UniProtKB/Swiss-Prot annotation:
Cofactor: FAD
Gene assigned in the entry: etfB
Cofactor note: Binds 2 FAD per dimer.
Name of this protein: Electron transfer flavoprotein subunit beta
Record family assignment: Belongs to the ETF alpha-subunit/FixB family.
Biological role: The electron transfer flavoprotein serves as a specific electron acceptor for other dehydrogenases. It transfers the electrons to the main respiratory chain via ETF-ubiquinone oxidoreductase (ETF dehydrogenase).
Entries under InterPro entries matching the protein: ETF_a/b_N (IPR014730), ETF_b (IPR012255), ETF_beta_N (IPR033948), Rossmann-like_a/b/a_fold (IPR014729)
């Protein structure tokens, strides 16, 4: 079984600050981390590899050269190969352009392996820096394969996957044949830590770079020219004011109801 996992290096959102004038993210001095949902996606692939040693896991990331840090972390966790899609032409890509570029890279990697498609492509449900949850589904659309999003449990039998797909009311069970793209939620698993031995081996690994030409990407569909999305402003949500606490003596239920009704009438809610 051939599995590809898309991973991304993201700024630690706990440290991110917004420029109050430009309304852009201030990245200087902000540490970068392995996108948490992508770690869940990788752990799902590693669990399948634990159960079947014939499983091969390929990692793919798109970004600057420093994104190789998360690829090496993924190799240290147990992935077999890793590739970085990096090109100045990709700068400014929105989710549409990113999905297209990654799909082009996936096609090339599959062809290089002598296969038509990867059996399973795994992505985190979203990246914590953009929170769009669009790139995974966009890749599936570009490749013309089924997609199952928000996976909280994955079972593989033969060339079929059965997935518990998380939703607001609980979950639904969805089945699909290979090839399929699946996006992972946090409840899917608990990602393992890289081993010391794996970390040392990963440091010595050469991670190949792929540019736009290598994956036959159309310049009109990548970067700013291929990105119809225009970001007008980035901002932090305003802090909520504290809730109103109503107090009465002797657990007088009628007094509580009267106070609540008085407040609702005063605010013209009723």
């Amino acid at each position: 079984m051939e599995i590809l996992v898309c991973v991304k290096q993201v700024p630690d959102t706990a440290e991110v600050k917004i420029d109050p004038v430009k309304h852009t993210v201030i990245r200087a001095g902000v540490p970068n981390i392995f996108n948490p949902f992508d770690q869940n996606a990788l752990e799902a692939a590693l669990a399948l590899k634990d159960a079947d040693k014939d499983v091969k896991i390929t990692l793919l990331s798109m970004g600057p050269d420093q994104a190789k840090d998360v690829l090496r972390e993924g190799l240290a966790m147990g992935a077999d190969d890793a590739y970085l899609l990096s090109d100045r032409k990709l700068g400014g890509s929105d989710t549409l352009a990113t999905g297209y570029a990654l799909a082009q890279a996936i096609k090339k990697l599959a062809a290089d392996k002598g296969i038509e498609q990867f059996d399973i492509i795994l992505c985190g449900k979203q990246a914590i820096d953009g929170d769009t949850a669009q790139v995974g589904p966009q890749i599936a659309c570009e490749l013309g394969i089924p997609q199952i999003t928000y996976a909280r449990d994955i079972k593989v039998e033969g060339d079929k996957v059965t997935v518990q797909q998380e939703n607001e009311e609980g979950y639904i069970v969805t089945e699909a044949q290979f090839p399929v793209l699946i996006t992972a939620v946090k409840d899917l698993n608990e990602p393992r830590f890289p081993t010391i031995r794996g970390t040392m081996k990963a440091k010595r690994r050469e991670i190949p770079n792929l540019d736009a030409a290598a994956v036959a990407a159309d310049d009109a569909q990548i970067g700013l020219s291929g990105s119809p999305t225009k970001v007008r402003k980035i901002f932090t949500p305003p802090q909520r004011s504290g809730g109103l606490v109503l107090k009465v003596e002797d657990d007088n239920e009628q007094a509580i109801v009267d106070q609540v009704m008085e407040k609702l009438v005063a605010q013209k809610i009723i």
